Curated annotation (Swiss-Prot):
InterPro entries found in the cross-reference section: GDSL, GDSL_esterase/lipase, SGNH_hydro_sf, SGNH_plant_lipase-like
GO MF entry, a single one: hydrolase activity, acting on ester bonds
Compartments where found: Secreted
Organism: Arabidopsis thaliana (Mouse-ear cress)
Protein's recorded name: GDSL esterase/lipase At4g18970
Positions annotated as active site in the UniProt record: 35 (nucleophile), 325, 328
GO BP terms, alphabetized: lipid catabolic process
Superkingdom of this protein's organism: Eukaryota
Main location: secreted
Keyword Aminoacyl-tRNA synthetase: no
A Gene Ontology term for the protein's cellular component: extracellular region
UniProt keywords, alphabetically: Hydrolase, Lipid degradation, Lipid metabolism, Secreted, Signal
Amino acid sequence: MARVCVMMMAMAIAMAMNIAMGDPIAPCYFIFGDSLVDSGNNNRLTSLARANYFPYGIDFQYGPTGRFSNGKTTVDVITELLGFDDYITPYSEARGEDILRGVNYASAAAGIREETGRQLGARITFAGQVANHVNTVSQVVNILGDENEAANYLSKCIYSIGLGSNDYLNNYFMPVYYSTGSQYSPDAYANDLINRYTEQLRIMYNNGARKFALVGIGAIGCSPNELAQNSRDGVTCDERINSANRIFNSKLVSLVDHFNQNTPGAKFTYINAYGIFQDMVANPSRYGFRVTNAGCCGVGRNNGQITCLPGQAPCLNRDEYVFWDAFHPGEAANVVIGSRSFQRESASDAHPYDIQQLARL
């Protein structure tokens, strides 16, 4: 647990420094993503992908909010480190001048492709999230009273995008519902995702976004759900899935480099969630983890065959589990990922900037 304590202390110091300076180091934080960072947008949707029930939020100060975690998500951690005095409001609840702090558009089960996650019901796709942001931008213009003023304000904000996981988990590797796995090679599928991703980034850029943090896909083949289904020993990750994830991530890095070279006035960076996650799994004791292959709350093999059910009693030693449920990291892991995204521990954590550096550019 020593490593976790050191990281928590460093996080507390960074937060104290930002608070001491007064305002957050970025005026606003816009979040696009899926269940890893959804903070309640799916609560009002007709969807199986919802987490607004106990024991989700068991360790969160506001209880079950729709976050797919026992506590904070990675973006909650980053929000604190940026110096905000409260978490970013989900789009479904954002009203008035609150949007000047930023908005969380993330939606559980969402993907880059429109059809991704449809078997789970309603969700807000990447394109839908960007469309919601365009609506937010028009509101920012109305509040600030001038397009130039709004453009200047928005250019200083952080735009975090973390999508693609469901395009593999709830599309490419789900042949019962989707044909993409037989239509595309892993390389061709990643190209298709990157092309669609690029379209949305251009829309965001045309609506004032200038500081982008593109979060790579984690090692989905190591999740309790995949281990329960596809691992003979319940420990060995599914390399078929992880290999496809690495192909996408490699192309995302190339996209960051391309945009940095060809997009006037904008800065892009890549957050290596895959590498940070792999470090936690390979060196669990460094972070105080004892269980890397099972959910703290779930049903069946690896607590991963069915995800955490309403009212189910979770494990008591939650900080010792990398995973909270069948798919999602717990707060302890999110603190590690969020902290290293904000201030990289090694050069490989972020390319070419960490989020703190991006905010100060």
